[in-house]
Structures are given as C-alpha cells and as structure tokens.
Amino acid sequence: MTREEKLQLIRDRQKAVRDAWSREKTLVWQGKGTVNWNSEQQRELMEKGRVSGYEGQHMKSVSQYPEYASSADNIQFLTHEDHLAAHNMGKVNEQNGYHSVTNGYYDPETHEMHSFGNNPPHAPEAHELSNPCYKGAENSYSQSNGNEQKREYSKLASNAEYSHESNVGKNMSNGYAMWR
C-alpha cells in the first residue's frame, strides 16, 4: 500500500466515525439512539458532536475489509473497555489492543460478537432512549419557556442537521439490541 493509500484509509476511517456521530446526534434529537445515552451524555452529544468515553468501533475491521472503512454503517459506539473486548473475544486486553480482526456487531451486555459473515455491515439498531431530553423539544420549549430557551432549541436543532444519506427514518432493525 502506498503512502497516499494509507493516508486515504485513515481519512476514510475518520469519516465513518464522524458520520456515525452525526447520525447518532440526529437520532438523539428524535429521542432515539444506538446507545441508551443518559441526559448528560445526550447534552454532550448535542453540544460537542460526540460523547466522551465512547469510541467508534469499525465492526468489520478495516485491515480485512477496507471497502467499508468510510461507511457509518460499519460503526458502533463502545466504551474503551468494550472496544478492546470486541477485538479480544470478550476480554479487555490492553496488550493486544485493537489488532484482532472483527467482523460483526459486539454486544457489550452479553460480550458476544454477532458475525456479519460475508454480508456487508449494518448500523446498530436504534431504540427509544429511556430518558430522552430532546424528543418533542420544540413544542415544550415554544409553549412554556422563554426566548432564551427557544434560541437554545434553534441552536441545537441546526447543529443536529444531518446532510448526507443515512438510515435515519428507515427501518434500521438488524436483530441486535444495544439495550433491553
């Protein structure tokens, strides 16, 4: 692989994670998420575009499946420990790091990998958040709160826009639940 090809692969990986965070932000705005974010995490996502303590995991390893490197559908959000466990058969192993190949959705609750086999990756299923902070925010802000909160709503709404094709609004069911 040439130097330019390696650099392009790095850009593709970063794009996939950025796009997945954008999609997650849109989902949270709708009261959903691929992770059951608490209210502080939802606010952080809306304000910063990501949630500290979470990493974008390429479900189909880029080393073996470079064709999916730039796909947001190939990303799931995991804590650092769960990300390591996904690469190390359910065990957190700092020494091995992220070098083990993955090909599936890692369930952090059961510590099981659900293989994609020869199929392309698909985005983790979105669920209703247990404590949504933004779903229906426009109505509650505009009916009962002052202009300052309306401006904050407008700011958050414009930041939550997701401009490119995604699975938002489509059936994202894949049979794997991030929480029950």
Task: List each model region and its residues.
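Nuclease and nuclease-like effector domains acting on nucleic acids or nucleotide cofactors
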Residues: 1-55, 62-179
